[in-house]
Amino acid sequence: MTMTLRYLLLTAMISAGAGVSASWADSRFGHYVGKFVAEFGGDGRKVKLIEPYGYVDPAGEQWDVPAGYLTDGASVPSALWALYPPFTGAYRSAAVIHDYYCDNKQRSWQDTHKVFYNAMRAADVDENTAKIMYGAVYLFGPRWGPGTAPGQRNAAPKATPEQQEEMVEKLKTFVETENPDLDSLEAHAKRMSSGPIMPLRKDGE
């Protein structure tokens, strides 16, 4: 995706959604705290959170994002952008939470990716879409180990963008035909990533 197209997508998405309340929820998946109010940062490519915003997961753990946080959706793999741009639709609120905790690495990559799924479901993202996005993040999203400093570079995926797109399509087919639970989805992602296209990364495991 070109930077121009990415910019246009972000412009349309924020213009349409800024200030929308996050008070909806399927309580089984937690709930949001505050409102999503955002604007573009000075570089025209990042989104700046204007008001504090947060999410409480099903276990009661709070995932807060402070006002002033800048995000560009980078924690959502680029292979998903054509299908699910990270700042459009109901999953926008979950993408901000996920970006922030991928940046600061306060919690494990496993918990951070799992909260992306639960936060999407709490925002009424349909089950299949949430599973496809979670599976792709599990495959290609950032990973880190204990003690990794905020901002420290993550290992790059070992698949090209074209290979990632191919794997996302296969993941989509698996979710739509098998309706896996999350444990089965993670196991399937591991099998995919241990194949000839992309050996499973060992970083942060």
Stretches with model-predicted labels:
Residues A16-A22:
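C-terminal segment of classical bacterial N-terminal signal peptides
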